[in-house]
């Protein structure tokens, strides 16, 4: 596992963004772990979070022109990613985000920041049902731009109601790559190697066996 992945897991655990235990997801599914990126909520947290996204971008070598953060959670992520890319790697990319409600005065429209043009890197925390991606694709298509890739913090690598995960459905429907800072396999490797969390291994393995893709 790359060091930035291990560091990100430690960071998420230290902020209680990532927790092991027993949790009920919105779907009603019982999960042995929970991830809530909304708890990255200080300036220091967002600065570090942006650096992890930037590290994943560098590792993937994805080619893109604009960072797009869909409302609402994607807005601070997109901003922190663009700042981290510049501060860490000297890469200066424009950033754009949308508002949920169209504004009919001032600058108007539903996009703020850079024009949505060229190859778009969409950044968000997780993909649960893929709804935010589908809404974003309407904006990207309407602006005659192209979705280069999607980058999220965590890929749970679990199927939804069908055989595919929401991420696999996005990749299939939009012919794009979905990247992540970490995925379920990284989490499994981390707890297998760390005695602090090894007690959660049986539940994690059982969960992956039942719901994994």
Swiss-Prot record:
GO MF annotation terms: magnesium ion binding; orotate phosphoribosyltransferase activity
UniProt keyword terms in alphabetical order: Glycosyltransferase, Magnesium, Pyrimidine biosynthesis, Transferase
PROSITE patterns associated with the record: PUR_PYR_PR_TRANSFER
Pathway: Pyrimidine metabolism; UMP biosynthesis via de novo pathway; UMP from orotate: step 1/2
EC number(s) from the headed UniProt entry: 2.4.2.10
Gene3D superfamilies from the UniProt entry: 3.40.50.2020
Pfam family, one: Pribosyltran
Binding positions for orotate per the UniProt entry: 34-35, 128, 156
EC class (word): transferase
Reaction(s) catalysed by this chain's protein: orotidine 5'-phosphate + diphosphate = orotate + 5-phospho-alpha-D-ribose 1-diphosphate
Residues given in the record as 5-phospho-alpha-D-ribose 1-diphosphate binding sites: 26, 72-73, 99-100, 103, 105, 124-132
NCBIfam families: pyrE (TIGR00336)
Oligomer status and interactors: Homodimer.
Protein purpose: Catalyzes the transfer of a ribosyl phosphate group from 5-phosphoribose 1-diphosphate to orotate, leading to the formation of orotidine monophosphate (OMP).
Name of the protein this chain belongs to: Orotate phosphoribosyltransferase
Organism: Haemophilus influenzae (strain PittGG)
